[in-house]
Amino acid sequence: MLQKREKVLLLRTFHGRTLRIVREHYLRPSVPCNSPLCPQPATCHNDGKLLSSDVTHYMVPDWKVVQDYLEILEFPELKGIVFMQTACQAVQHQRGRRQYNKLRNLLKDARHDCVLFANEFQQSCYLPRERGESMEKWQSRSIYNAAAWYYHHCQDRMPIVMVTEDEEAIQQYGSETGGVFVISFKNYLDNFWPDLKAAHELCESILQSRRERENESQESHGKEYPEHVPLEVLEAGIKSGRYIQGTLNVNKHRAQIEAFVRLQGASSKDSDLVSDVLIHGMKARNRSIHGDVVVVELLPKSEWKGRTTALGENDGDDKALGESPSEPMPTGRVVGILQKNWRDYVVTFPSIEEVQSQGKNAQKILVTPWDYRIPKIRISTQQAEALQDFRVVVRIDSWESTSMYPNGHFVRVLGRIGDLEGEIATILVENSISVVPFSEAQMCEMPVNTPENPWKVSSQEEREREDLRKTHLVFSIDPSGCEDVDDTLSVRALDNGNLELGVHIADVTHFVAPHSYIDIEARTRATTYYLADRRYDMLPAILSADVCSLLGGVDRYAVSVMWELDKTSYEIKKVWYGRTIIRSAYKLFYEAAQDLLDGNFSVVKDIPEFKDLDEKSRQAKLEELVWAIRKLTDIARHIRAKRDSCGALELEGVEVRIQLDEKKNIHDLIPKQPLEVHETVAECMILANHWVAKKIWESFPHQALLRRHPPPHQEFFSELRECAKAKGFFIDTRSNKALADSLDNANDPNDPIVNKLLRSMATQAMSNALYFSTGSCAEEEFHHYGLALDKYTHFTSPIRRYSDIIVHRLLMAAISKDKKMEIQENLFSNKDLEELCRHINNRNRAAQHSQKQSTELFQCMYFKDKDPETEERCISDGVIYSIRTNGVLVFIPRFGIKGAAYLRNKDGLVVSCGPDGHSEWKPGSLQRFQNKITCTTTGGESVTFHLFDHVTVRISVQTSRCHSDTIRLEIISNKPHMTPDTELLQQCSLLLKSDLVKEVTRSVEEAQLAQEVAVNITEDYQKYCQTKGRSLYTLLEEIRDLALLDVSNSYGI
């Protein structure tokens, strides 16, 4: 029977007054204990994760240990941890949402042997707070009391070790209950885990950092930064309009000088500002770090500054030579931080000379983060000299107003500087990507498909699903070598003369149950991560490449959308959604499908499904397939024309096709020619996504997951308009239809690169497409700008995207009749769905950034060992696409590289070009105009560079110990680079990118084989490489764009 108590809460108002609030608190005779030793598991309702039975004791951390040592408690070696509800709530209230979510994810993770015990709802465990008792003492008393009850509940069969940092608690409770031990966390590690070196090192690092903070707080220092305004004052200031709230974005090219705050929430609606707010200098940033949610006070207009327009190299100089800022913009200073965005940071120790200059016994070391946007971090360690050649991970603990730099602690070593695996690990950590293997508990939920026990369709599913195996010609069209097929198509004539178009998607949700271990893991990952030489899957291969993959000639479960179309106009008459069983008849590659569409039937010999047929059967089946492909293409043309009339955009993307040998290693990388079948498949997928979006919104108007693409801000188009104007084109950006038509008309017949660059600029001006819950936005905000659709979602790739899994569940709930209530119980509320959408959006950005950074890594490694003075491949044609005050931005079509080329160096010399076009550095000056820049020497020689001029560029690599290497471009001639294969250049060929990946990978493999003694490379490889073996295909498939000109997903398709 429930017992009711009253819980008193003391809350502070905006005005600083304290309110006493009394809430009802109900106690239960039993709550889940999640122990295998439970004498009454049915009474305790132990339905979730249980603690391991293979442990010598249970460990109960108190609230302070959970707060300070959570990263050690995350070690999978530490088993049998019982987190008390009291400790978890202390983390939530005192450390904020980020730390609390980290703890929640730890409890959900099947790889970690830990559980939550709701001690404050258990009748025998709950202790009311005594009058005059401090919150800290009550929390320790409650946790100890719950630990003692837990010991007796398990029939005194498992010792309990409570770990705490409270010496008084150790003295008071240490010998109070037999079988329940109370010790410090350091003693716990010393006694129970003496060989867990990483935990001991991390513990010492955390203790050292804490001691440094305590010492600093006792010393009297002058203020380096102003104190932050109290929270209640910040909230009142935001509400009154005095302050502005937004996210801090640091300019990575001028990280010491420039940062911008983009308005969000109430600030963006109530403010008259139409641009970001400039935060100039570290003092004005006031200890905020890139990504923090900050509160800003605007400075008087007389103190506003302009955005820097010069090229920068993060050299820390406040004023570049001849720098001329843009027009003054709103400028402010940070007065408070609402939410810190601290995470793990990859850093590098200073060189041995710098360490020695600080003194032989110096323990405080300033380490330099890999990310330019993060300030140096001060840590305490005696390993600085030993680790100076390694990339390591640190965490920030505090940033006091008396300190120039934040304080942090050392966490772990990643790998050697410059080593491929170490650099890849750096990219993963910097984007908060976890790539641990799938756990045993997760794999136990997976279906089995082996020669001894093959997977097959169940009789129950045959009864409940629509069986299309004998009635529909279903086939897939995918890139060459693709093995994880998640979409197939069908089209057929109906008896009434109309047509039926079908899109059939892998039924992943049949195998991934809501709230299962694999579902929680997929939700955490949110997407499959594609790097330049590998991939990390969202789902195990047994699903992604086997039983969920819609391979040819095998039975598979699918979720289908089928439309009845008018036979001539292709207007949609009706639509059907449902679960189906399909057997794909053909697994076609794009090129083969295009050949069949064009009437080139010689490709038939390369289609496996035709090989064993006699001539008559082959001809009949060929005619059937060709009719289907041509009819699909005709339907897709009609769909596309309809979207075009509404303003659908076609923006620039560079795609490549991977050619494989028999062993599935890369044989070649060929520029992907635009084929009409690409458009055909894409239009069918867009149609399915659109109609599913409408269906789930109609059924769940307040909790459907859709994808919106907001219209871009008009000021973001200014550079696009000016560049187009330089070529005599007018770009109308008032609507998506006007923009699409303008881009179509902006063609230079003598230089196709111009239109590609203009479309690229249009892409960069776009807002990001975002997932959202329909209950959190007004319906007029649902629109997808890039696709010109009123409602859109992602339904067609559940193998790779968790958003699609949610959409499949919503669709099943919308069309279900028999189990409607049961299915709907597993759906997210609007609040929970919106939180999930924020997580997925965040993970999508991380996936895009990591792919781009890994591509840049490979580009640098490819050019790093080549002599730019003699190597022919280091000289290439480039196109100027932007003018700056001290140089230009150049695009190199052959490699897809974008970068800065300086026209004035650090010595103040400017580029001068002779009659033959070759350049040299001479004293002189620069004069920048809107669409051109002129270099004039003191001798009177001048050369002018215009927008879209072709120049000859030398490519080299700017190396860095602390940061990633970067591509360096130098204009060596103001004339185009002449190559024997001009057609290759016109196609923006990325042919040499195959050499880039193959050569870098091969050189790394050879180096590893040559080294008999590797420095923990094996350990790092096992930790960060999910895909085994040397097959580059299993790592590279699905990569659509190895170039930096990555715009294929920028506008949200």
Curated annotation (Swiss-Prot):
Domain RNB: 465-816
Residues carrying Phosphoserine: 989
GO BP terms in the entry: mRNA catabolic process; rRNA catabolic process
Keyword Hydrolase: yes
Cofactor: Mg(2+)
Catalyses which reaction(s): Exonucleolytic cleavage in the 3'- to 5'-direction to yield nucleoside 5'-phosphates
Signal peptide: none
Highest rank taxon of the organism: Eukaryota
Protein name in the entry: DIS3-like exonuclease 1
Originating organism: Bos taurus
Taxonomic lineage from the root: Eukaryota, Metazoa, Chordata, Craniata, Vertebrata
